[in-house]
From Swiss-Prot:
This is BMP-like protein unc-129. Interacts with netrin receptor unc-5; the interaction is direct. It comes from Caenorhabditis elegans. Keywords: Glycoprotein, Growth factor, Neurogenesis, Secreted, Signal. GO terms for cellular component: extracellular region; extracellular space. InterPro entries: Cystine-knot_cytokine (IPR029034), TGF-b_C (IPR001839), TGF-beta-rel (IPR015615). Pfam families: TGF_beta. Glycans are attached at residues 27, 42, 211, 395. One of its GO terms (molecular function) is signaling receptor binding. The keyword Signal applies.
Length: 407
């Protein structure tokens, strides 16, 4: 039986009990999730992406969050071009090297924006043409077809999108390192490509499907190799092991949550001085809240209701990416939640709880106790820059616990 990604993530951090986790293990886990090979998150820097590309990927990322998936794939890349020359003519060169093995290219789009939005914008957009340039003897040059711009009809006046799926698909399967395109305009000469990139911000968006499962064996192996290198250099003490206890998820750093009556909930200050996660790991020790407040906060990913400390609830830690230097790459999220379900289920179950019908029946007749387990699992989505500076969105399905209940 195939294990779910959430199980793999928890098995790496081992947070079900008192854990002993070091910086190397955390770094290697994040590196594997981002599919990085060797880059040091504290060294590499990139130029700033164009505003249009950033806004496009931001909208896609928000769609992933809202829909918890995307029908076009679980991996999206946005690539900005460099200017090259082929057969004496300028071309746009996109870096498609280093894609995942066994990756399925689902769709590719070439985006182009018209800088001037005047009365002639629609006519100019109709005059723009794009075609792929074959730099491999086994491929063929293709004229790209335009895709109708969804949403606001006015977008068609200054935004052009071409279907580049076939060209990118061929480049990937021919092991090409670059996808090359030429953009022209009917009855008119195009401006120099360097200026065109600056003003029209063309970029290539590629949707793919990949097997997103955390490789725990590889993570542990790479962690040991990192430690071995450090020992060889005599720097064993540069990374310490940290002891910490799993804690109910809450956020002591955020502003107090306001209730409908305008009052604020005070936040717990009972954080152990030995807790390595202090400052970005969260702990709560709250008194029983009013019923209406409980209902409002029950689905808050950071809030655990402690009416009964032994009740079925979600527990874990929030790992800050900034604390480990990965904020240089990762745009969103700021933290990674590693949580699990913990607590006991009453026997017999009470109807006031959120138990399933099966749990209610089992609590009456079965010898085995009812299990505290996830009632739903959510995706973990990364929006980041990869080692080559390309903007990427990765979707790991069923990696986060939405809520826990007695099942």
């Amino acid at each position: 039986m195939r294990r779910l990604p959430i199980v793999l993530l928890l098995s790496v951090f081992s947070i079900a009990n008192c854990a002993k986790v070091d910086v190397d293990l955390i770094n290697e886990t994040i590196r594997d999730l981002l599919h990085f090979k060797s880059s040091d998150p504290n060294v590499t820097s990139f130029h700033r992406s164009s505003h249009t590309l950033t806004e496009h990927m931001k909208n896609l990322y928000e769609n992933f969050i809202d829909e918890d998936s995307n029908e076009d794939g679980n991996l999206v890349r946005a690539i900005e071009p460099a200017v090259g020359k082929f057969e004496g003519q300028e071309v746009l060169v996109f870096d498609v090297e280093g894609f995942d093995s066994h990756e399925s290219i689902m769709r590719a789009e070439l985006h182009f924006y018209l800088r001037r939005r005047d009365s002639f914008a629609r006519r100019r957009s109709r005059q723009i043409r794009a075609k792929s340039v074959c730099v491999n003897e086994y491929c063929r040059q293709q004229t790209l077809k335009k895709i109708r711009v969804g949403g606001d009809e006015n977008l068609e006046e200054y935004k052009v999108i071409w279907d580049a799926t076939k060209s990118v698909f061929d480049s990937y399967h021919l092991d090409a390192k670059q996808a090359v395109f030429r953009i022209t305009r009917e009855h008119s000469k195009m401006r120099p490509y360097a200026e065109m990139i600056r003003k029209s911000t063309p970029f290539l968006v590629i949707y793919s499907k990949v097997n997103h499962t955390l490789d725990t064996v590889s993570v542990m192996k790479q962690t040991e190799q990192t430690k071995r290198k450090r020992r060889d250099l005599g720097n064993e003490e540069l990374r310490e092991y940290y002891n910490y206890n799993s804690i109910p998820l809450d956020n002591d750093d955020r502003e107090p949550i306001k209730r409908k009556n305008g009052k604020k909930n005070s936040l717990s200050e009972e954080i152990s001085s030995e807790d390595v996660w202090q400052g970005f790991g969260e702990e709560t020790s709250r008194e029983e809240r009013e019923r209406i407040a409980n209902e409002e906060l029950a689905n808050d990913v950071r809030v655990v209701l402690l009416q009964n400390k032994n009740r079925c609830h979600k527990e874990g830690v929030l790992v800050s990416l900034k604390h480990f230097g990965w904020d240089r790459y990762v745009i969103e999220p700021k933290t990674i939640e590693t949580s699990f379900c913990k607590g006991k289920c009453a026997k017999p179950m009470l109807t006031s709880g959120k138990a399933s019908n099966h749990a209610m029946l089992q609590s009456l007749f079965a010898a085995e106790p009812v299990c505290c387990a996830p009632t739903n699992l959510k995706s973990l989505n990364f929006w980041y820059r990869d080692e080559k500076g390309r903007t990427v969105i990765r979707n790991y399905s069923k990696m986060l616990i939405g809520s826990c209940s007695c099942l």
